[in-house]
Amino acid sequence: MNKTAVFFLASALAGCASPAAVEHKHTAEVAAFEDQRPSVEMDRYTAEKLNALLKVRQQAGAQSTGQLSEQISRAFMHTPYAANMLQGSATLAEKLVVDFRGLDCFTYLDYVEALRKSTDQDSFIKNLIQTRYTGDGVHYADRRHFFTDWAHAGQPLTEDLTAQLSADAVTVTKHLNQKANGDLYLPGLPLVDRDITYIPSTSIDEQLLSRLQTGDYIGIYTHLAGLDVTHTGLFINTANGPVLRNASSKKRQREVMDSPFMEYVQNIPGIVVLRTRPDGQAFTPPSAPEIDAQSARQPSQALTHG
C-alpha cells in the first residue's frame, strides 16, 4: 500500500483512525501478563490506570449500563488522541494491545465496553478480546474493523436501533472495504455487503434525542463508498445538555472530550445508533413511530455514492 493510500485510510476508515492498524511507535516500557494467552502489550501507565478503573468498576456495583458507560468513559477525559494504536495487518501478526496513553475513536469504545463488563484483569482481557474480535482469538482477519461490525459480525455486542428510532431513517447497501475505484481499503480482507441505516442530520431533533440513552454508541455516517462511518463516540446526557463524548482528531482538540451533540451533528450526513444489550437481559427496543417499509425514504444516487 503506498503512502497516499495509508494516509487516506488513517483519515477516513474510522474517521479518527484506521482500523488497518500499523505498528505504533511508542517506546514506553511494555509489560505482559505472563499467565495470559495471548500475551498482552501494555505499558506501566496503562497497567496502573487499568487497575484503578477496575476498582472503580467494582465499587460501582449494579448500576445501569448507561451509568457505567458514563462513569468509565469520563475517566478517559482529556486523554490525548492518537491514531493507529493497534498492531496487526494482513502481513503483520496481530498483537493484543492495551494502551491508555492515547486513544482513537474506535479503541476508546473498545475499552469502555470491555471495562463496563469487567471486575478484574482476567475478565477485562477476555472482554476486550470479545469486543475487538469476532472470535475467541486475536487475529487481524477477525478484528471488528467497521463500526457496524459491533451489531452485525460474529456474536453481536449491540443492537442497531437506527431504523427503530426515526421514521426518516435511510438505508443504503454498502460494499464495505471497497473503494469507489474498486480497490480495497484493507488488502487481504473480504468485501462485506451490508445494509447501513442512518438518520439524516436534518431529522435529528428533540423527539429523537428523547429516544437516545446515555451510553448509546454513535457512528457518524459517511457517503464514502466502502465505509459505514468516519467517526464514533458515546451519547451522554449531561446537566448542560446532550454531548458526543469522543476521541477527537480535530486539529485544535485532539483529545477525549465532550462535544455538544446538536452542534456536532449539524454538518454531518447523519448518525448510526448502536445500543448495548443489558447484561443477561432480553433486549427491548424503544418505542418509535410506525415505519412503512414501502414508503421509507430511499437515498438518491448521489447520496449512495457520496
Residue ranges and their predicted role:
Residues 4-12:
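Sec-dependent N-terminal signal peptides
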Residues 197-208, 221-222:
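Short alpha-helix capping/helix-loop boundary micro-motifs
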Residues 22-103:
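Cationic-aromatic interfacial patches
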Residues 224-226:
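Short, charged beta-turn/beta-strand-edge "cap" motif at the junction between a beta-strand
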Residues 214-219, 230, 234-306:
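Low-complexity, Gly/Ser/Thr/Pro-rich intrinsically disordered linker/tail segments
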Residues 79-195, 213, 219-220, 237-240, ...:
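Acidic/His-rich structured neighborhood in mature extracellular/periplasmic domains
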